From Swiss-Prot:
Primary localization class, coarse: mitochondrion
Modified residues (Phosphothreonine): T400
Region named Disordered: 405-441
Name under which the protein is recorded: Mitochondrial inner membrane protein OXA1L
Biased composition (Low complexity): 418-429
NCBIfam families in the record: yidC_oxa1_cterm (TIGR03592)
Described function: Mitochondrial membrane insertase that mediates the cotranslational insertion of integral membrane proteins into the mitochondrial inner membrane. Essential for the activity and assembly of cytochrome oxidase. Required for the correct biogenesis of ATP synthase and complex I in mitochondria.
Transmembrane segments: 114-134, 140-160, 213-233, 261-281, 299-319
Species assigned in the record: Bos taurus
Subunit-level organization: Monomer; predominantly monomeric at low salt concentrations. Homooligomer; predominantly homooligomeric at high salt concentrations. Associates with the mitochondrial ribosome. Associates preferentially as a dimer with the large ribosomal subunit 39S of the mitochondrial ribosome. Interacts with OXA1L; promoting cotranslational quality control in mitochondria.
Family recorded in the similarity comment: Belongs to the OXA1/ALB3/YidC family.
Length: 441
């Protein structure tokens, strides 16, 4: 019994020990196989009287080869091979501001769709602004400034001509002031002879030297249509409004369709306009040349400030650009080399004793008001005298003596005798209250 058990244990240990013959090899599988216990019989004569069998239900973990392919796995089709996805190509980065500008330009409506732009002066300016903004890529404030500089460059020849005339007037200013003083005194005193004599002499002097006092003022007036056209064009664009104009500003005035929230632009424009007029950047005549012009120039910027303070910032952008161009222009035209190239006469420095004394603003204003009142009184008196003369020429002759000299007096009574005087007074007693009704003939 003990020997049989010992033999059975040895056979069992042999079965449990990993062997090469128990490894499955790759290849077609042959089923059914012989039972693993077919050769595991134990002889009865050694162990027991009847045979014993041991069945191994599962192989050990080292009994299976990792390179084996089972029958079930051989029947399953291999999955399709999916090619690896290539990495995305590098896309050049675009700045956010440029991308926004491109998108906005693509989505922005044209001025023709918005009802702006035409062949009128206002429409042509709007078309030019649209070209600067859309085609050249300038922001709205830059487009307005560029169009302003372009317009000012076109009228620059007229400004140069005005500078020439202003230089002539300044060089002959002492003689002009003398003639003006004579004319003013003759007008105040009512001396028509002296008035016409001084006026004729002044006219002859101006023709001799080719001087026209109002020519420097007329030439810059050609800029008035340009300014009005720019003003109307920008105001229409702001009132519509153009969508991109609401974000085309600068610094604190990003929205060009609204007025300046802190009123900096109106004040700066007023200050620059005063400097332009005071320096004579447009006319070439400094404010010290003519007294009445100096007073008018100093009052005009302050007078227009309450009217223009609520204008859209797009209008102020044009106005500020124009004023800055004018200040740079007057600084450039004061260079002697530039004046020589442009054939502008040099300004003569006059002796202060030969010029009329300058008065203060209030004193000159009061004197001018007084002179205007006196001139009005003289004109009123002349008008009344002229009316009396016309009435006397059209109406009947008025009697200017006590009796009618055409009446025949008595032969014995001379005209100056008491009888004649009594007879004449008795005959005209009824008409003595209204002697002017008597007429000759």
């Amino acid at each position: 019994m003990a020997l049989a058990l010992m033999c059975g244990r040895r056979q069992l240990l042999c079965l449990l020990r990993p062997q090469r013959q128990f490894h499955s090899v790759a290849g077609p599988c042959q089923w059914p196989r012989k039972p693993l216990t077919a050769g595991l019989g134990f002889p009865a004569d050694r162990c027991l009287g009847h045979p014993r069998y041991v069945l191994l239900m599962a192989p050990g973990p080292r009994g299976l080869s990792t390179s084996a392919v089972s029958f079930g796995e051989a029947q399953v089709p291999a999955p399709p091979v999916i090619p690896a996805t290539p990495p995305p190509t590098a896309v050049p980065e675009v700045a956010s501001g440029e991308a926004a500008d491109v998108i906005q330009a693509a989505a922005e409506q044209s001025f023709a769709e918005l009802g702006l732009g035409s062949y009128t002066p206002v429409g042509l300016i709007q078309n030019l602004l649209e070209f600067m903004h859309v085609n050249l890529g300038l922001p709205w404030w830059g487009a307005i400034a560029a169009c302003t500089v372009l317009a000012r460059c076109l009228v620059f020849p007229l400004i140069v001509k005005g500078q020439r005339e202003a230089a002539k007037i300044h060089n002959h200013l002492p003689e002009i002031q003398k003639f003006s003083a004579r004319i003013r005194e003759a007008k105040l005193t009512g001396n028509h002879t002296e008035f016409y004599r001084a006026s004729s002499e002044m006219t002859f002097y101006q023709k001799k030297h080719d001087i026209k006092l109002f020519r420097p003022l007329i030439l810059p007036l050609t800029q008035a249509p340009i300014f009005i056209s720019f003003f109307i064009a920008l105001r229409e664009m702001a009132n519509l409004p153009v969508p991109s104009l609401q974000t085309g500003g600068l610094w604190w005035f990003q929205d060009l369709t609204l007025s300046d929230p802190i009123y900096v632009l109106p004040l700066v424009v007023t200050a620059t306009m005063w400097g332009v007029l005071e320096l004579g950047a447009e006319t070439g005549m400094q404010s010290s040349d003519l007294q009445w012009m100096r007073n008018f120039i100093r009052l005009m910027p302050l007078a227009v400030l309450p009217i223009t303070i609520h204008f859209p910032t797009a209008v102020f952008m044009y106005w500020l650009s124009s004023n800055m161009f004018s200040l740079g222009q007057v600084a450039c035209l004061r260079i002697p080399a530039v004046r020589t190239v442009l054939k502008i006469p040099q300004r003569v420095v006059h002796d202060p004793d030969k010029l009329a004394p300058r008065e203060g603003f209030l004193k000159s204003f009061k004197q001018g008001w007084k002179n205007a009142e006196m001139a009005h009184q003289l004109q009123e008196r002349e008008r009344r005298m002229q009316n009396h003369l016309e009435l006397a020429a059209r109406g009947p002759l008025r009697q200017t003596f006590a009796h009618n000299p055409l009446l025949q007096h008595g032969k014995n009574d001379p005209p100056n005798t008491p009888n004649s005087s009594s007879s004449s007074s008795s005959s005209n007693k009824a008409k003595s209250k209204q002697p002017w009704r008597d007429t000759l003939g």
